[in-house]
């Protein structure tokens, strides 16, 4: 990804090239392969933080003429072409589950995930320490079970729609998104 931005900057074409095994030089206007650029674009925008077919639909994949039956393949191809990103989601998810259930700290790629208790204040948080030293706080973290029967991370926070304090579910991709945005802000 960094090399794409260092050179030509054609991230959608590069994504399509990786996903479909087509030389990037063929993904240009006038060529039949140019139709793959749209799939690369929607995949980049929808899938980077662990989105799936629903995220593709929300990003307008169907409105762009991508058939619904093609969406699972796009998700699979994007994840296969971006293994390091995919692996980071799962590493963050697994680390958060471990820290919430067992305590301690786990470092992942310059981030430190910790369970912190302040008995004087009565607070219990999972924190993620960023490279800058700033921390992201997840209040009253817990583990439940998601719709697939896997551990589900949750914390208390403000519901963005109702503006009420409630338990919010999260997952590895969302934790990665929070960190990426916070790191960008720190720069």
Task: Give residue ranges: language-model regions.
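Conserved catalytic core of nucleotide polymerization and phosphodiester-bond processing enzymes
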Residues: 1-187
């Amino acid at each position: 990804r960094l090399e794409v931005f260092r050179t030509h900057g054609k991230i959608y074409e590069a994504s399509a090239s990786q996903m479909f095994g087509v030389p990037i030089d063929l993904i240009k206007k006038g060529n039949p392969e140019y139709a793959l650029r749209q799939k690369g674009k929607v995949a980049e925008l929808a899938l980077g933080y662990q989105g799936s077919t629903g995220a593709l639909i929300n990003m307008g994949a169907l409105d762009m003429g991508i058939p619904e039956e093609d969406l699972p393949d796009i998700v699979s191809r994007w994840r296969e072409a971006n293994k390091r990103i995919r692996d980071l989601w799962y590493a963050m998810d697994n680390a958060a589950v471990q820290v919430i259930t067992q305590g301690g700290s786990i470092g992942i790629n310059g981030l430190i995930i910790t369970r912190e208790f302040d008995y004087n204040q009565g607070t219990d948080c999972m924190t993620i320490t960023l490279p800058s030293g700033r921390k992201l706080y997840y209040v009253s973290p817990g583990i439940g079970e998601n719709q697939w029967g896997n551990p589900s991370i949750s914390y208390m926070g403000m519901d963005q729609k109702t503006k009420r304090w409630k338990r919010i579910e999260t997952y590895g991709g969302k934790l990665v998104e929070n960190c990426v945005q916070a790191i960008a802000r720190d720069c």
